[in-house]
């Protein structure tokens, strides 16, 4: 009970970091114009009037390529701290990272065989 003063800065930061986004959303909701005209309902294409049908369906290949990119981007995020602290952590963590890499390589081979990496 006597050591709770250590967490005062944490609670202050938590409250402030929660209140600021809520206030930003509330202020924008109050100040934003509500009128919906033809300009608001039209599609936006880099400031140019849309030509033809603005609703275009993307091929699933783009989504698969993005998904594979995200998976290996997350892999990099996990492997970087491991590589920086490899000398401190020792062999057991090396084995865990090796298993992690093995699982990701199996996933890469699976995506490759399914054709998720083929662009054409």
UniProtKB/Swiss-Prot annotation:
Disulfide bonds: none annotated. Its main location: plastid. It is a multi-pass membrane protein. It catalyses: a plastoquinone + NADH + (n+1) H(+)(in) = a plastoquinol + NAD(+) + n H(+)(out); a plastoquinone + NADPH + (n+1) H(+)(in) = a plastoquinol + NADP(+) + n H(+)(out). One of its GO terms (molecular function) is NADH dehydrogenase (ubiquinone) activity. GO terms for biological process: photosynthesis, light reaction. It comes from the Eukaryota. It is found in: Plastid, Chloroplast thylakoid membrane. Its EC number is 7.1.1.-. The chain crosses the membrane at residues 9-29, 64-84, 88-108. It holds the Pfam family Oxidored_q4. Keywords: Chloroplast, Membrane, NAD, NADP, Plastid, Plastoquinone, Quinone, Thylakoid, Translocase, Transmembrane, Transmembrane helix, Transport. Coiled coil: none annotated. Gene3D superfamilies: NADH:ubiquinone/plastoquinone oxidoreductase, chain 3 (1.20.58.1610). The keyword Phosphoprotein does not apply. GO terms for cellular component: chloroplast thylakoid membrane. HAMAP family: NDH1_NuoA. NDH is composed of at least 16 different subunits, 5 of which are encoded in the nucleus. Belongs to the complex I subunit 3 family. NDH shuttles electrons from NAD(P)H:plastoquinone, via FMN and iron-sulfur (Fe-S) centers, to quinones in the photosynthetic chain and possibly in a chloroplast respiratory chain. The immediate electron acceptor for the enzyme in this species is believed to be plastoquinone. Couples the redox reaction to proton translocation, and thus conserves the redox energy in a proton gradient. This is NAD(P)H-quinone oxidoreductase subunit 3, chloroplastic.
